[in-house]
C-alpha cells in the first residue's frame, strides 16, 4: 500500500504543471501554473488585479486546462485577459487534439469575445492569434460551463447523494480509482492486496457518511420525528443552513460537554414547548438576523436532522494553523500535527490534498492506520472523487487529476470511546469565478510562490456579507460603477492596513460579500478587532449610494 501512495504522489507531481484558463468574473486569465515546490518559480509577473466576481444568469464562466508548454505562444497567452459577451456558452466538453480542433476553438473565442483586454505586457490581438501556430497535437483542453465551474459541493446535498448509493457502486468506483493509478504507472499488485485496499476504503467511506434527513414542513411533525429518534437511541442534531458557504448551527447544544437528553425530552412534550425552544436557542445569536422567525424558516426552507456524535472535532483543509488560532477559521480547522499540508504555496488552489512521504509513512503501517483521524485524512480525497463522479463534474479517474477545489474544508467528529465516526461538514467549490489568492499574487508577485507566503505568514482569508444583493444591484449597474466600488473599498481598507488587506468582492445569490485577509503575526487576532473591522465595512457600504 505504501508503494501505491508513492506512485500516487509521483503522478501528482507529473500532472501538476498545467496551463490554466481561469475565470474571474467575466474575464478569463490565461496563465502558466507551476505548483512544483521543488522547482524554481517561473512566475515572473503579477496577476491582473481584478477582484469583483459576479455570478448571474446572463454571464458564464469557463475553465480550460492545457498540458504545459514553454513555447513563446504560451508565454503570450499567459499575459492575456479575454472579456466575453454576455449570454454565450462554450460547448462542453471541448477537446483539442489536432489543429482543426484548435481552429474551431479559436473561432468560438472570436464569436464570443467582443474585446481583448490587454494587460501586462500589452500584446496585440494579432499576436494572440499566433497561438494558431502552436502544434496542439495530442494536447487536450477541457472546458467546463458555468454550472459545473461554479458548483458548490455541500454536505446537505452531495454527501447525502453519495451515501444513498449502494455499496456496489461505491466499491466499483473505488476500484476504478485505484486501477487507474496502477495501470498508468505499470504497477503490479496481487489481487489480495488490491481487494484489501478497496475493502478498507469502502468501509471507511460508508462509515463516515452519517445518514441525514432533510425535513421541511410542519413543526409538530418535526417534533415527532425527533421524539421517535430518541426512542430508538439515536440522538438527533438539528442543522440549519442559511448561506451558500455551508454555515450551519447545531442544536441542541451540549452542556458541560454532554448532550442533555432530559432537556430535549422536556421540550418535546408538545408543539408549543418545542416552538418556544427553537425560538429561544436561535434568538440567542446576537446581531444576527439569519435566525429570526426560525419556525417559519423551517416550515418554508427546511432543516437537516443528523445523528449526534459525541467526540472530538477534527477538520481537514489546506491551512495548517496553530490550535490557538483555529477559532478564527470559518471552517474550524484544527492542528492535527500533520507535516506541511500546504506544500505548494497556495491556500485555495492546487490539488485537493497534499501529502508528504514522511506523513504517508506515519499513516500507513502494514496497511493499518495508526490513528482514525489520519485514516480520515487520506480517505477524503477518495470521497471527493466519488462526489465528483456522482455530480457529473468528471467522468473517470483520468479527469480527476485536473480537479481543484476552492474554499475546501471538511469537519468531522470521532467518538473517542466508541470509535464512532461522523462527517459533519464538507465545503468545496470546483474551479470557479473567484480565487482569492490571485489577488495576493497580484500584490506579492513571485514572492507569493517562492516563500510560501500563506504558510509562513499565516494569512487567513475570510468573507463577510455586507449588503443584500437587491440593494447592491440598485447601487451598481455598469463597469464604471464597478471600478468606483473597487476603488472605494480599497481606500476604506487603508485604516486597517497594518492588519487587514482587501482581497476581493464576490456577488452570490444571497448577498454581496467582501473577502479580506489578515496577518497572524501583525494582528493580535482578538475577536473584538475582527468584529470592529466587519462592522466598519458593513457601515461603509451605505456610502456607495453617493458614487453615482
Annotate each predicted stretch with a short phrase.
Residues 392-410, 453-457, 544-547:
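Flexible, glycine/charged-enriched surface loops at secondary-structure junctions
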Residues 2-41, 82, 116-119:
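N-terminal leader/transition segments
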Residues 179-302, 357-382:
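Active-site nucleotide/adenylate-binding loops and adjacent lid/helix of ATP-dependent enzymes
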Residues 445-548:
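Peripheral (often C-terminal) accessory segments that flank ATP-dependent C-N-forming ligase machineries
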Residues 40-55, 65-233, 242-244, 251, ...:
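Conserved N-proximal alpha/beta basic substrate-recognition cap immediately N-terminal to
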Residues 242-244, 308-312, 401-406, 510-511:
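A short catalytic or substrate-binding loop motif that flags glycine-/basic-rich loops and adjacent residues
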